[in-house]
Amino acid sequence: MKADIHPNYRDVVFHDVTSDFKILTRSTMATKETIQWEDGNEYPLVKVEISSASHPFYTGKHKVIDTSGRIDKFQKRYAR
């Protein structure tokens, strides 16, 4: 087996910026940001726009999640 070809599998905090939900899990995602977790340790931070904490399918609530302004751009373009 070749040495040093496998990705670094480590503890990472995922932060759903839409619902302000954070979860500590393991991943190979690379990031430069870090955050101090509840246990006092510092972990790499990966920000995501949507997760099961904010997705309408999992929450049962229908709400529009638009983080890049696409809905406003569409409504302005096709407004009557």
From Swiss-Prot:
PANTHER family: 50S RIBOSOMAL PROTEIN L31, CHLOROPLASTIC, LARGE RIBOSOMAL SUBUNIT PROTEIN BL31A. GO terms for biological process: translation. This is Large ribosomal subunit protein bL31B. It comes from Stenotrophomonas maltophilia (strain K279a). Belongs to the bacterial ribosomal protein bL31 family. Type B subfamily. Part of the 50S ribosomal subunit. The gene is rpmE2. GO terms for molecular function: structural constituent of ribosome. The keyword Ribonucleoprotein applies. It comes from the Bacteria. InterPro entries: Ribosomal_bL28/bL31-like_sf, Ribosomal_bL31, Ribosomal_bL31_B, Ribosomal_bL31_sf. Keywords: Ribonucleoprotein, Ribosomal protein. Pfam families: Ribosomal_L31. One of its GO terms (cellular component) is ribosome.
